[in-house]
Amino acid sequence: AFLTAVVLFCVTAASIHFFAGSRIEANNREFGTWINSKKDHSYNAVAANLHDDTYLMMGSSEFQHGNNTPYHPTAIFNQANMDVMCIGAAGNQCLPHAIAMGALAPDLKSKKVVLLVSPTWFAKGGIGKSEFSARFSESMYAAMLKNDSLSDDLKQKLIDRTTKLLEVSPLMKANVDRATKVLTGDNLNNGQTQKTSLEDKVNYYIHSWIAQEKERIGVGMMWKLSGHKNNRTYEPQNAKEPDWDALKIQADKEFEKECTNEFYMKDELFKIKYKKVLKERKDSETKRSFEESPEYDDLKLFLDICKDQGIEAKLILLPINGYWY
């Protein structure tokens, strides 16, 4: 029975390996605008698909909404033949992106990144521990620690913030603590000597290999199941500037007839979700403030990493509807 189980496991593993493919390089511009959390969590998958003309774009839930419209970033940049690597989903805020930036900076040949900043990130508590653990990538974290050009001071800030937020996820925190110990030795951890045992090193490298293999297979399977394919080589296209004025006029015209209520929400959503709670929700957010938040420090950390790594960063503050947002 044991031998049969081993044989079945080997056959299954080999089949998955064959289907997923042996390489992560897609050589396909659509890989960057493919919105998928497994891709976002895999340092190797993202780094392998950063080309000379790739711009990095980081954000959150806006990547998951409106992707069937011509106004979604993926649609706009694909049409303009621009190679953009999008990273982000609901729950992403400045800190996960700061870790990813620290990891990917040496691979980002264009040295350009755009961060889509959502005002709602700057709530009093900043990013929640559960949200952070859900968006945390062990492989991005490890690659950040391996980035020899990133200053020890910035690494230490990322380590401290990560360790605190992962308190709700003991297993993930244990993996992070082990990675930090093995990959930094005595250099960090606020000057405290860390004795890295042979057992720690063996456990880390075994766990790291298994995790990377799972990432590679997971990304490869999802990429192919979504109908995409790998190309033999990457061929840069002649990128062009999107016609922003025309897109704005088109969007205003299209949504004007869909947002006729007093708050300029989409009528369908307003009728289903908000109209019935207007009275009880009135003035409920008047005392809410975004003036103080640890998110500002996380944003500064992101920008400090960009400066340290010679990355040109552009921040886009997402527009919000002041009547109700």
What does each model-identified segment do?
Residues A1-F18:
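Hydrophobic membrane-insertion alpha-helices, especially the h-region
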Residues R23-M82, I99-M101:
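Membrane/wall-proximal cationic-aromatic binding patches
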Residues R23-T33, A80-N92, K279-F290:
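Acidic/glycine-enriched edge-of-secondary-structure segments
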Residues D52-T54, M82, K109-K112, D308-K314:
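Loop/turn elements at helix/coil->beta-strand transitions in domains of secreted/extracellular proteins
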Residues G59-S60, L115-T120, Y274-V277, I316-N321:
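Short loop/turn segments at strand-loop or loop-helix junctions that form parts
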Residues F63-K157:
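Membrane-embedded segments
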Residues I76, S284, E291-Y325:
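Extended hydrophobic/aromatic segments used for targeting, binding, or gating
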Residues A143-D297:
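Secreted/periplasmic serine-hydrolase-like ester/acetyl group-modifying domain
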